[in-house]
Amino acid sequence: MILPSFRDTADEALAVAAAAEEAGVDGVFCYDHLWPMGQPERPALAPFPLLAMVARRTERVHVGTLVARIGLVPDQVLLAEFGALSVLAPGRVIAGLGTGDRKSAAENEAYGVPPAPADERRAALGRCAVELRDRGVEVWVGGGSRGTRLVAEDAGVVVNLWDVPPAAVAEQASRSEVTWAGPVPGAGPGAIADLVAGLASAGATWAVFAWPVPLATMVACARATAPGR
């Protein structure tokens, strides 16, 4: 699940992470935004300090970014942040990476970090993905465009698709491992169960829901679609 990080304090996110581990959730993730999309007046917690706190307070759950944006900090700084997180949570880190897009460009501009051209960002994405992969870190690439999906496929890492239907997952699953992330369906437990089952049938290896999440329902749906069930 994606933690509630658009807050003034980390209290809620830490409580949610603890509840997630207790409930049997496989992983918790954090956005890498300087503010919620289109809402610059609202706060946003930085992902790596928050995930570091989660790592130290948990024993089993994976911790990851969804997604850390290439170019927001120098590549070597980004790699070092994942390295430090891996020390705190060995074997539990998922490095979600992305290039950003027009929707997030305003954040870069506001903080004096104008985004590089798309081809340069994709090249840097490929280098970072390969470096982290070679270190033994699981890497997911946000596949919002065909260009970034090709980078992930070339690097042999996972493609993460945001809020797409199972048919799009199935199409990508023919080319690479694929995970899904998005909001919880608003039509109740039955809709969640149908979505999770559809994603599993399509080949998604993870389904990551954005907070707020009905934990018990989500875990029950995941267990019902697990291999051998």
What are these regions (language model features)?
Residues 1-229:
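Active-site-adjacent structural elements that line small-molecule/cofactor binding pockets in enzymes
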